[in-house]
Amino acid sequence: MSKVKKNDETLSEVLVDVNRVTKVVKGGRRFAFSAYVVVGDKAGRVGAGHGKAKEVNEARGKAKQAAKKRMMKVPLYQNRTIHHDVVGKSGAAKVILRRAKAGTGIIAGGSMRAIFDSLGVHDIVAKSIGSTNVYAMISATFDALNKLASPKSIAMRRDKKVNEIFVKSSDIQVNE
């Protein structure tokens, strides 16, 4: 299996978080910078990475490399929203992602917006519950995105055709 070469020119990069971190040693304190970056191709692929170095630019570069290594493909509905509602969790953070009609826009708080911009989603409603820590929220968002499945992949798993997956409202029987 060969690795697919990722074109750097087509990837968008968003710096989500930068922190100054300190390591206490015998002779005093050593300062460094920690960066968290989200990269995506705005066409259904996105990744996030963390980097640490003595300079901000070096930390950002390391974070971008880590994000490119962790890129994942997300199935999108009409290249603008997700196929179905989904919940993701990471520690005390919980996010709810809901599909939205065309023209709704990205209704999301904090670092989730950077993920959806890089992913190429135009219409989505996202709500974060619990922890608002940047790392936990991004991890919970990626957990939710991992749970997404397209109708085609669901049909393949069930050995059915795509049109057999969807239930028409006229076919639903109500027991009275």
Swiss-Prot record:
It holds the Pfam family Ribosomal_S5. Keywords: Ribonucleoprotein, Ribosomal protein, RNA-binding, rRNA-binding. GO terms for cellular component: small ribosomal subunit. The keyword Transit peptide does not apply. Residues 11-74 form the S5 DRBM domain. Coiled coil: none annotated. One of its GO terms (biological process) is translation. InterPro entries: Ribosomal_Su5_D2-typ_SF, Ribosomal_uS5, Ribosomal_uS5_bac-type, Ribosomal_uS5_C, Ribosomal_uS5_N, Ribosomal_uS5_N_CS, Ribsml_uS5_D2-typ_fold_subgr. Part of the 30S ribosomal subunit. Contacts proteins S4 and S8. The N-terminal domain interacts with the head of the 30S subunit; the C-terminal domain interacts with the body and contacts protein S4. The interaction surface between S4 and S5 is involved in control of translational fidelity. With S4 and S12 plays an important role in translational accuracy. Belongs to the universal ribosomal protein uS5 family. HAMAP family: Ribosomal_uS5_B (MF_01307_B). This is Small ribosomal subunit protein uS5.
